[in-house]
Amino acid sequence: MIRANETNDCGGFFMDIDREKEGKCLTVTVPCYNSESYLERCVESLLKERDGLEIILVDDGSTDRTGQLADQYARAYPDVVRVVHKKNGGHGSGVNAGLMLANGIYFKVVDSDDWLDEAAFHKLMSVLRFWCRTKEEKRPDLVVCNYVYDHLEEGKTKAVRYGNLFPSKKSAGGTKSAVFRRNSILSCMR
């Protein structure tokens, strides 16, 4: 578990984190605020593909049991799940906190009220594991996937497809569907 620290210059987070988890292929950051009613579905969908996966649950100052649920996952899956508890700073600050602590070669954000289809996530992880085994200079900076947006309250479903957006020889696959190479994002922040 990582707690915010007001005294350093990295957005308030300890940067002397455990680096033994390096070598993960994908870090998924889940920004959470008062997510206790749906966090379990989100995390359980991610845990179906633990090999090469790091999950960072960022509790953004929740006032419900979100933080305790996140801590339970970290205790149950210590090699996969890490938790950050921080003062409420909004969705973007939660994403940034996860990015700063990520060890994966690739980085993805999954909102706490979202979940991943098991077959689709398996296919994505298979592709990412392939790229993670290749030489760094050959890895794509961005992998984009189709996704389905289910608006449960309205009973509406919308499939979002990216097939014709990229040249076919140049693509490997909104941030809902994007997986970024972590170092590519960090280089933009320097």
Positions of predicted regions on the chain:
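Nucleotide-sugar donor-binding/catalytic module of glycosyltransferases
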Residues: 2, 6-190
